[in-house]
Each structure stands twice: as C-alpha cells, then as structure tokens.
C-alpha cells in the first residue's frame, strides 16, 4: 500500500464515493464496526464505480465541525482501500495499488515506486477538508496553464446527433451555441475512418472528409468563424476488429494467449504497455491534430480491462497511457 494511517482510539465513519454511468461520485457514509471494510477497482482504471478517495471521520463530524482525515490516490488504475477496526478498537486506514492480479518481478538492484497518496486533515469538518484538497491540487498537482482558468462551457455533438452528422451540422451547432453564449463545440465520435456506428474503425484515426464534406482544417475554420472554440473526440486506447489497424496487428489487442478476447461495446483494448502500439496511435493522432487549431480534446474510454494476461500488465498499461498523454501535452 502507498499509505497507512493508524488511530489508537476513536469511533469513526468511513465515507467513500460510488457511481455509474452519468451518476458519478455518490457519497456513502458507513459506521466502521469491528472487522474490515474494503473497496477498490479491478477494472484496469480507477473507475467511477468506486472513486480512489476515502474520508475517515468522527461520527459527529459535519460540513463545518469535527475531525476528518482524507486520502486521495494519485493514480488512474487498479486500487484498493481498506479500513479496519480491530479487537481493541484501534483503527487502520490503507490506500494503494490493488494486489489482486498484480505481481511485478524485479531483478537484482531494481526498485519499484508505488503511486502517491495525498493525505489531509481537518478539525473543522468536510468543507475545510475540501478546500485544502482544492488548494493542494490546483497549486501542486495541476501543472497546465489552465489550472487557474475558468473552464469553457461546451456543447457536444454526441447527444445532438450521435454518429449522424456532417460538417454542415457541426457548423449549425456552432451557430446555435454562439447565440446561447456557449464557448465551444466538440465534434464527438464518428469523424474518422468509416465510423457510422460503434462496430468499426476504432484504431483508424484518419479524417472522413467525405462525411465532413471537406477537410478538418476547413471545418475548424468554419467553427471558429462563428466565434466559438473547436474540440474533438478521441478514444486512442481502443480498437475495433473491423479496422485496418486490427487486420494488420491483431496481436496489439489485449488478450490472453489461446483464448478469445472479451468484447465490450464491440471493441477491444490496445496494449498500451507496448511502446510500438503507443507510437503508432500517437503518430496517427498527431497527423489529425496538426491539421488545424484544435482547442480541446475529449479523451474517452468506453470499456474496462478484462483479459489480464500478466501480473504487471495493468500497471505498465497505466504508465503507457501517462507516457502517451505526456507526449501529447509536450507537443501541443
């Protein structure tokens, strides 16, 4: 585990945050009786099913009064959180990597560094704890120039049109957005390959100019001419079996050797623990981004990891995603 907090006395509640699609981070407060309360993720992501955060609070703690201790795990993959009250009423709180399906062999002299946990304490209730976390994250974790900027209000083409759009309908959406004071239009899934439904083309990151009725550069200029910013959707970690990429490199999808892969939303996950896989997708994405002034990127991930073929896969996969993101941020 990355963090361990021992309390020699006290009677505590555990607060964690569960969720599902379109209903993330619901607060659940439970009295910690004798035994162990645990939650986490085995999905390959930190997940909105169970958020990698926990609060240990005195039973009478409120928004504005009382003791509370927070832990935030600064990591995007599998995790485990445990709270235990033992037979002599001591309490222990643990947060870190999940050890289920996890092993990481080290050669002589090699080291392994676990991700960090941000811990915070408040004697003045949950609001103060929240403010402390806000300050810490904005000052010391967020490093982009946007850390202290007001976020733009955006409208997304997905709920407006799903896959059924053209360049003209995106521009019409931009005109309507401008009239309502909306700052940005995001062109969602469906702009690439032969992507008119969710059965094909993930992994083939080239602009479908026939669908857009012109080049991406022309569309971006038309949207900007309406006085709004332009954003674009990507799902770089995923691949459809009906794609040029999969036909050329079926071994790039995560699967257990000798077994059929598990599909979800008609897609498989690319093995981002492998540099050659990341490099290919990075080059494709950059060839798109270089075509015009893109203001915003929506990075999607629409399925969880199932075919874990090795104990180090999930961890190395997350590091691969971080490497990919770092390269994008550095380049743009």
Give residue spans per PLM region.
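Glycine-rich, aromatic-flanked loop segments that form ligand/cofactor-binding clefts
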Residues: 52, 57-79, 121-145, 153, ...
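Glycine- and charge-enriched low-complexity intrinsically disordered segments
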Residues: 146-162
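Core alpha/beta catalytic barrel or barrel-like domain that forms the active/cofactor pocket
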Residues: 147-152, 183-194, 233-236, 292-303
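Aromatic- and glycine-enriched glycan-recognition loops and surfaces
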Residues: 157, 161-247, 253-254, 279-280, ...
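Active-site neighborhood of glycoside hydrolase catalytic domains
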Residues: 208-226, 246-332
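Polysaccharide-binding surfaces and accessory modules of carbohydrate-active proteins
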Residues: 1-84, 100
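Short Pro-Gly-centered flexible turn/kink motifs
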Residues: 104-123
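Short acidic, Pro/Gly- and aromatic-enriched capping/linker segments at domain boundaries
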Residues: 87-107
């Amino acid at each position: 585990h990355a963090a361990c907090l021992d309390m020699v006395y006290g009677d505590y509640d555990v607060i964690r945050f569960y969720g599902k699609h379109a209903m993330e981070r619901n607060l659940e407060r439970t009295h910690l009786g004798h035994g162990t309360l645990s939650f986490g993720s085995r999905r390959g992501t930190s997940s909105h099913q169970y958020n990698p955060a926990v609060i240990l609070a005195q039973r009478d703690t409120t928004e504005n009064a009382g003791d509370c201790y927070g832990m935030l795990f600064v990591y995007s993959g599998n995790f485990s959180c445990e709270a235990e009250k033992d037979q002599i009423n001591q309490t222990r709180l643990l947060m870190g990597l999940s050890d289920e399906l996890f092993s990481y062999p080290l050669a002589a002299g090699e080291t392994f560094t676990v991700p960090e946990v941000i811990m915070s304490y408040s004697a003045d209730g949950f609001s103060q704890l929240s403010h402390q976390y806000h300050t810490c994250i904005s000052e010391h974790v967020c490093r982009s120039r946007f850390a202290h900027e007001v976020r733009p209000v955006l409208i997304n083409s997905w709920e407006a049109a799903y896959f059924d759009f053209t360049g003209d309908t995106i521009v019409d959406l931009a005109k309507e957005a401008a009239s309502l004071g909306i700052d940005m239009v995001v062109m969602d899934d469906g702009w690439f390959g032969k992507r008119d439904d969710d059965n094909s083309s993930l992994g083939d990151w080239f602009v479908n100019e026939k669908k857009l009725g012109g080049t991406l550069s022309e569309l971006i200029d038309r949207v900007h001419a309406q006085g709004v910013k332009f954003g674009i959707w990507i799902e770089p970690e995923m691949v459809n079996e009906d794609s040029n990429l999969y036909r050329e490199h079926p071994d790039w999808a995560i699967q257990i050797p000798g077994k059929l892969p598990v599909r979800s939303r008609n897609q498989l996950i690319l093995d981002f623990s492998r540099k050659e896989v990341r490099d290919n997708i990075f080059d494709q994405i950059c060839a798109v981004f270089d075509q015009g002034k893109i203001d915003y990127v929506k990075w999607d991930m629409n399925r969880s990891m199932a075919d874990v073929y090795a104990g180090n896969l999930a961890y190395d996969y997350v590091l691969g995603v971080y490497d990919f993101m770092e390269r994008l941020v550095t380049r743009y």
